[in-house]
Every structure is written in C-alpha cells, then in structure tokens.
Amino acid sequence: MEGLTDRQLEVLRFIASQIEDHGYPPTIREIGEALDIRSTNGVNDHLKALERKGYLSRDPVKSRALIPTSAAREALGGGETGSNVVPLVRGPARPGSRMIEIPIVGRVAAGMPILAQERVEDTVQVDAFLLGTNKKVYGLRVQGDSMIGDGILPGDYVFVKKQLNADDGEIVVAMIDDEATVKRVYFEGDRVRFQPSNPRMAPIYVRHSDFRSTMILGVVVGVYRKLT
C-alpha cells in the first residue's frame, strides 16, 4: 500500500470526521472550503490519488459517495469498526459529555417501501455532540439495501430530524402510498424523484401535482451501526 502525503492524509481525515459527525461524507466543494483547496480539480486530484492508493472508495457521479476503506481506517487509527458509522455501543463517555436518549420508533425500508411502525420499540443513548444542533430526532431501523451507496446498510439505524421540507438531494424518510421509505429526494419540474443509491434499484416517482409536504417525515442526519 502506497503511503500518503500530508495533504492526502488531511483530506482523508476530514472525510472520516465528517462521516462520524454527520453520518454522511462531505461534498467536493465542502472539502475544498474546509482545507483551503482553491479548485474542485485540486480536490479531485487528491480523491483520485486516495482511490488509486486503496484508501477511498468513490462513485464519480455522486458528490457524497466517498467511503474510507479498511486501509484508511487503519491509517487513521480506527481499526476495523468503520469510519462511515458511529457505533451505538461506545467506550467510556468523553469528559463533560452529555448523553441524550433517542427513541427508536420502528423500521424503514431502504428497498421496497414498508410501513414504519409509529411506536417506540427501544431507545438508544448517544453523545449529544454527535447530533449537533439537531432537535426532535428519532431513530428508525433500516431494512433493504437500496441506500448502500450512501453507506446505509441493512440493520443500521438512521437518525431522522423531524421536518416537512427538504433540500434537493437530501436523504429523507418519505411516506409514499401510506408506506415509509428512505431515499434521496430530487424536485424535477413536474415530478419528484425518490432516488436509491444502489444502482440496481429503480427510483420512485411522484407527480408534482400529487406531492404533499406531509410526505416528508424528516431528513436523515446520521446513520449509526450497533456493534456486537
């Protein structure tokens, strides 16, 4: 395995920290702004080098599909637990940390839509710093593999911020035909597209005239994996 330059290590460390803090990778523009890399081409050069050296897996057509490999986790001192998730079961709490309890209200499909049961099945305690300023957050357990391109795997928990609106391209939990599903949402003229990140899966389309804001149950602000 080839070694990393100081700059490549900075880029890799920033990607891993953003995934841990927010549950998803940064965009190329966010990397450039954070590390003072003036052009997107410059960022892309570093990403290509990280991919070529085996430290990063990426999809060139998706701005956030940046997943550190096991070699990256070793280089960053993360072992085998994975940098793209934050385990629900952690070691001792950070000094001065504040733990909050998140309700797990059911399950949601990352595949064919299924009904998310609106009752509290369990709760998990998470360090408050992981959720930042997000309030009114609830958890859902994921079934299906249509969001694996975003690092959301079957059995993971998604933490969802309750809101009835979303920006173009955000990962949302949506209620479609009385069934809940997790997808990226895109507003495209006369229709709304709910897009999986697994290339084997087809998107779900809703005509703009049929779309209601109440279809959006919330925006995914993190993905968490329970370690055994």
UniProtKB/Swiss-Prot annotation:
It catalyses: Hydrolysis of Ala-|-Gly bond in repressor LexA. The active site is at 146 (for autocatalytic cleavage activity), 183 (for autocatalytic cleavage activity). Its EC number is 3.4.21.88. GO terms for molecular function: DNA binding; serine-type endopeptidase activity. It is an enzyme of class 3 (hydrolase). The keyword DNA-binding applies. The record marks 110-111 as: Cleavage. GO terms for biological process: DNA repair; DNA replication; negative regulation of DNA-templated transcription; proteolysis; SOS response. Residues 28-48 bind DNA. InterPro entries: LexA, LexA-like, LexA/Signal_pep-like_sf, LexA_DNA-bd_dom, LexA_repressor, Peptidase_S24_LexA, Peptidase_S24_S26A/B/C, WH-like_DNA-bd_sf. CDD domains: S24_LexA-like. Keywords: Autocatalytic cleavage, DNA damage, DNA repair, DNA replication, DNA-binding, Hydrolase, Repressor, SOS response, Transcription, Transcription regulation. Represses a number of genes involved in the response to DNA damage (SOS response), including recA and lexA. In the presence of single-stranded DNA, RecA interacts with LexA causing an autocatalytic cleavage which disrupts the DNA-binding part of LexA, leading to derepression of the SOS regulon and eventually DNA repair. PANTHER family: LEXA REPRESSOR, LEXA REPRESSOR-RELATED. Belongs to the peptidase S24 family. Homodimer. This is LexA repressor. It comes from Anaeromyxobacter dehalogenans (strain 2CP-1 / ATCC BAA-258). The lineage of its organism: Bacteria, Pseudomonadati, Myxococcota, Myxococcia, Myxococcales.
